[in-house]
């Protein structure tokens, strides 16, 4: 039709595939946002009609929570032959892979080995920083920390006690990746599989991706010394 404008990209098509937390998609959205702000500053205000329609006057379902698209790695098949004790490395590898720094936990393990043992938090921090990531070991995290980090697109390494009853957790500790938080659960990528968070130990070697661990039973295993005592590693680009 004469005078018609050709549209090369439809936002409606792009939104179908957008996942907050994917670095390349977030970067592209930021670029588009900056272009729109520069060319049409008024269009980006919340009082605009398009935003009211989008938000349905603030009536979105509050239970719709973000789960980050973190690739899964199992510690059980590590080429090192020591996968049974490499939960920390396989968890760190998932986050490094999420940021596009490694191909998997075997590659990550070869890098981490330069800095120390898999159980050594300092070795993990050095390996992550070597890959160009910001990494900080923390011992005073809480549920709010996980909500903030995951809602802003950053998965968190969490260290917790996986043996014994949730009422009296024990053991040397286990590491997994917190990829989201909902009203009743902390959502994990657990490199060892599906934990029995009520009684301790593991139910299955399978099912470790996007597993919902009930806050009622998992938090006592993480917040052992109080509501602000969670161990974890905060990682960002």
Give the ranges of each region predicted by the language model.
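Short, surface-exposed loop and linker segments with low hydrophobicity and enrichment for Pro/Ser/Thr
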Residues: 1-5, 39, 142-156, 224-229
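Active-site-adjacent structural segments surrounding the nucleophilic cysteine of cysteine proteases
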Residues: 3-117
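Extracytoplasmic/secreted proteins, especially bacterial periplasmic and envelope-associated proteins
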Residues: 13, 27, 31, 86, ...
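Short, flexible beta-strand-to-coil junctions
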Residues: 34, 160-164, 236-237
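Noncatalytic regulatory segments and standalone regulatory/sensor domains
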Residues: 68, 181-237
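A structural signal for well-ordered alpha-helical scaffolds and beta->alpha junctions
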Residues: 89, 120-121, 211-212
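Catalytic cysteine-centered active-site loop
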Residues: 102-145
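Active-site-adjacent substructure of cysteine-protease-like catalytic cores
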Residues: 138-197
């Amino acid at each position: 039709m004469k005078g018609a404008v050709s549209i090369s990209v439809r936002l409606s098509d792009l939104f179908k595939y957008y996942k907050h937390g994917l670095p390349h998609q977030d970067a592209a959205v930021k670029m588009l946002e900056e272009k729109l702000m520069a060319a049409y500053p008024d269009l980006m205000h919340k009082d605009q009609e398009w935003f009211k329609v989008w938000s349905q006057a603030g009536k979105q379902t509050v239970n719709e929570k973000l789960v980050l698209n973190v690739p899964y790695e199992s510690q059980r098949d590590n080429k090192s032959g020591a996968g049974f004790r490499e939960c920390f490395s396989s968890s760190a590898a998932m986050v490094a892979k999420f940021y596009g720094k490694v191909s998997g936990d075997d590659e990550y393990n070869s890098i981490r080995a330069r800095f120390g043992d898999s159980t050594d938090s300092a070795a993990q921090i050095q390996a992550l920083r070597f890959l160009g990531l910001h990494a900080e070991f923390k011992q005073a995290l809480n549920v709010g920390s996980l909500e903030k980090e995951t809602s802003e697109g950053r998965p968190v390494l969490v260290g917790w006690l996986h043996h014994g009853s949730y009422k009296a957790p024990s053991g040397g500790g286990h590491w997994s990746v917190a990829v989201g938080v909902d009203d009743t659960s902390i959502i994990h990528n657990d490199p060892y599989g599906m934990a029995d968070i009520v009684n301790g130990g593991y139910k299955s070697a399978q099912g470790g991706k996007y597993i919902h661990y009930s806050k009622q039973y998992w938090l006592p295993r993480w917040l052992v010394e109080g509501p602000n005592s969670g161990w974890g590693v905060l990682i960002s680009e």
